Amino acid sequence: MISFLRTTEFDAWLKALRDPIAKARVLARIRSAEAGNPGDCSPVGEGISEMRIHVGPGYRLYYCRRGELTCLLLCAGDKSSQEKDIRTAKALLKNLDSP
């Protein structure tokens, strides 16, 4: 079983998500990924992958692997903010990896 840890940025995004159906789908998708079924995912570069959720405006969760059984949810958004969210995820990862 894989564990997904969350950054404060990811938690803030999830808390601000007003659509209860979308929030439920995001949480269900994380549980599914923890059970080993990540679904529709794709690498976006620099060790970061995008988990796509096909509901509403098309939500995206950005994460990276941390060892064999751990992933870190960096940030999230939707299709309209995809490019900015990828830049944010890369910056967050770079800051986390800095000594």
Please provide the spans of the model-predicted regions:
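Basic, Lys/Arg-enriched alpha-helical interface segments
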Residues: 1-58, 66-71, 78-99
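Basic nucleic-acid-binding interfaces
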Residues: 63
